[in-house]
């Protein structure tokens, strides 16, 4: 009987990526299969996030529920990973005696040996160190799970915004070598992946080593990935404005695989608040990036992050944010009420904006961006959009579901054979959270056919050294 693993994930896309790697690791380690039911599992893993308010208490509430399962099954192993584990590992162990493993984002690859220690009668294991980017060398080969895949290209952040815990929980910026990334994506493409989303806390700060000891910039990486046969759509997240250089903007001008959509967090439209946040740029510099992007790619749509009610935010500061929103015309946003994160510089500032004022401002901001997004959706009526078909529709399994370049969900009727491929769909209806379309053409009528498979590319460029170690030479 196979052993079962249950993973509960909170937080950003990086955490989702890490959880998928944990599942692959545990499958390779002892054939663990994932289960949605915690009560069925032999190992429970909680991948935590410290961005939101009361993150630590949320962890203890969850562990309290799992403690009851361990009382019924003493052999059950419970592990806590992610950013709260990295920041509060010792506190977790002191308050939750049921926890066996505590590991950070950079040490998840050590899970099998930690579990072996526990099974051998060892005490609870805590490993929240920052061993550079070692984890990528220890993880199993990538496995595709649908036509779209996330690939982490770097870890950590060195910007130290005053409100953010990421540099303290994930460490400084460290980039993966170029060859490792290209090899992983080529392997995914060979398994049917058509869309890749490059991941990093500050993805456009990527500076990866090449095989000849040069440094590959993020703009160069984008072009390398876009050139891989089978990868017809390319995304990345999350970016920082101060790293959004002209060479990246130039890629939008000549690389059609790069989607006409960008998530570029700004947090505030007030120069005074941006300075308090230690963002390193002013509102006009952010707008300059958007202006140059739209010159290079006129149809590009922008989403962003906003923090509402940062300490000292006045009515004029909020008005400046709304002015930026009006000037840029965002398609989407992730907007949140400010809450202090322990250990950050901003936590020492007086939180002098009332909760009622924060809620009112948040509602105003979200309402305005919803209006802007709806306007963009209506502009798509009657247009033909290229959709990557992900699978059956959630609401109607007799229909198919896919996404546009701008990540809008489109439901439409078509043959299931199109799942995993691109189709063209005419948009006929617009709803708040999705679009409806009619099938126009399949991939066999498009100019997307591969002339060379990723396997051919890998075979062409593989070289074994004297020790029999395979290297990928781009």
Curated annotation (Swiss-Prot):
Binding site for [4Fe-4S] cluster 2: 157, 161, 164
Family matches, as Gene3D superfamilies: Methylthiotransferase, N-terminal domain, tm_1862 like domain
CDD domains membership: Radical_SAM
UniProt binding sites for [4Fe-4S] cluster 1: 12, 49, 83
Presence of keyword Coiled coil: no
Co-factor binding comment: Binds 2 [4Fe-4S] clusters. One cluster is coordinated with 3 cysteines and an exchangeable S-adenosyl-L-methionine.
The MTTase N-terminal domain, residue ranges: 3-120
Superkingdom field: Bacteria
Keyword Transferase annotated: yes
Protein family (similarity comment): Belongs to the methylthiotransferase family. MiaB subfamily.
Self-association and partners: Monomer.
Function, in words: Catalyzes the methylthiolation of N6-(dimethylallyl)adenosine (i(6)A), leading to the formation of 2-methylthio-N6-(dimethylallyl)adenosine (ms(2)i(6)A) at position 37 in tRNAs that read codons beginning with uridine.
Protein name (Swiss-Prot/TrEMBL): tRNA-2-methylthio-N(6)-dimethylallyladenosine synthase
Source organism per UniProt: Shewanella sediminis (strain HAW-EB3)
Gene responsible for this protein: miaB
